[in-house]
């Protein structure tokens, strides 16, 4: 007899209802719950899957390189990065006939194409690539690497090459290898690539496999290093007149601390970036030699954590027990990793536009908008995932005995104080911010805009001034002519910083006013509300006043059994579910703010944002409605244009988003009745009734319907806004 799906759960495989399929899909990646799973086997499976993950990433990057080399215009773009539109790939079969072919034929080629808005052209150009051959070589190299990773994944599942449980639990060795090898060594290697290949290329000197051993990246070679004259490597940097990619105005420095931006490319100085990576690499290599492994020297993480107790005694046993708790809980580890990655991804979104490191990317406005939006959304998903796995940790892995009176236990004991404080902050921010917006809306609607309550963000302006922004007249730290800090920064370190922060050519410390003050507090409200939902979900995951034995029902339970009425919305899963909507709401406000402020600055019309962002109708009318015209006019009775595909995606995104509500607003009984009606009709329809199924149709559970609704809501929301950002920006700036 053929075994039914899912093979990993005999109980599910024998379920006579369609539950078998849906629960099988839902638990496919929940390795812990699979039949016959041991802790060692669990670690081995996850470890092997990492290689598969890396293979997918390398294959995807290889595909980018290959398609640009084959169908793109990289070599033409290199000659004129500001005017030529970078091509991602060709469109094989443009629908809607000749008008479509014409609309999508651009970028200096004779066939219809998609324009790249990911910034890969700028990245490849900055790191020293100049020809299609360079791209092909990179593509083939990554393809080979992907194959090696797939093989490694397979190999590490074979009995001879499976690491044992002790190997996975050896925290100090893993830290040493990851800090020194993964972060340290790779940072130094990247610094080496920048010094040996990218910087010479930016000065018009090509370094390839044929000559890289003969070309000195610096006139003195390694002499300055071994004689201790390290400052020689910073002498004679590129001048302000340097033309990127040529010898004109170029210097010989390889490791500098100039600060600010290259005047022509408006990106960070490559020599500053190389210096940064070298310093980071050296620090991490040191850090990777700090933990005790073979020779009994260095730190023991267990000793450090067990010793961490507040001298006042107010934190009980402090970090005692955390070493074992974290080491034995993959969910705890994943939660920490997701939280860290979430924060850093949001920082990437911020830094990619404020401190652009790739040549000319600051002037590709569509790419700037796309990259910011992309990274903020990714950060949102990662952060919510961190709390979800934190909650699963509390349900599945938390041991009250092991954590007696330590910081984890004490956090659970005073969770009411944490939750009520977050609740108070959210209410305070919400009522005050909305109150200001609504007041301003009313007075503007009645024709007296001068009666608006406009609050200058003086504290934020003071922080900008202390970093060197002179326009506010605060005379503090770097913006005070008499301060030691200003003299040091101008003459000793980062001399280009002050010029950059006070220049109108970049997005570094943009001028802020009452509109920024209000939207800042709206975003603070959204962040605190999202955090409240997530923190409450995790802290109540083991039990709450209404349901003290919640942990016994697992991470996601439906409304359970007699006398359990009203428990539909209190599983840890439901907190994650609700938080997702708030997360999307938060990222929406963040990206609306960033995009509108930048679009008005790029158009030389910053006044529009400043005047209209202080009341809600301004946001609806002058941001959303005004910028949606390219999407509404993407195609009409007169034909189509190059934005038509985004107009269609905008519509389609709305449709998917709206479909979500069908699942979100209806509960289980509706679906059971609908399915039974459909089955009845199916069985009485000629031809259709020849197709039978063995599984008894069972409707979606409440949790499943919510998931289906959430996925539609999320995907539709993102499709809609992605199309809006790209089309509204491309419609203005090409």
UniProtKB/Swiss-Prot annotation:
It is found in: Plastid, Chloroplast thylakoid membrane. It catalyses: reduced [plastocyanin] + hnu + oxidized [2Fe-2S]-[ferredoxin] = oxidized [plastocyanin] + reduced [2Fe-2S]-[ferredoxin]. It is an enzyme of class 1 (oxidoreductase). The chain crosses the membrane at residues 46-69, 135-158, 175-199, 273-291, 330-353, 369-395, 417-439, 517-535, 575-596, 643-665, 707-727. The PsaA/B heterodimer binds the P700 chlorophyll special pair and subsequent electron acceptors. PSI consists of a core antenna complex that captures photons, and an electron transfer chain that converts photonic excitation into a charge separation. The eukaryotic PSI reaction center is composed of at least 11 subunits. NCBIfam families: psaB (TIGR01336). PANTHER family: OUTER MEMBRANE PROTEIN, OMPA-RELATED (PTHR30128), PHOTOSYSTEM I P700 CHLOROPHYLL A APOPROTEIN A1-RELATED (PTHR30128:SF19). Belongs to the PsaA/PsaB family. PsaA and PsaB bind P700, the primary electron donor of photosystem I (PSI), as well as the electron acceptors A0, A1 and FX. PSI is a plastocyanin/cytochrome c6-ferredoxin oxidoreductase, converting photonic excitation into a charge separation, which transfers an electron from the donor P700 chlorophyll pair to the spectroscopically characterized acceptors A0, A1, FX, FA and FB in turn. Oxidized P700 is reduced on the lumenal side of the thylakoid membrane by plastocyanin or cytochrome c6. This is Photosystem I P700 chlorophyll a apoprotein A2. It comes from Guillardia theta. The gene is psaB.
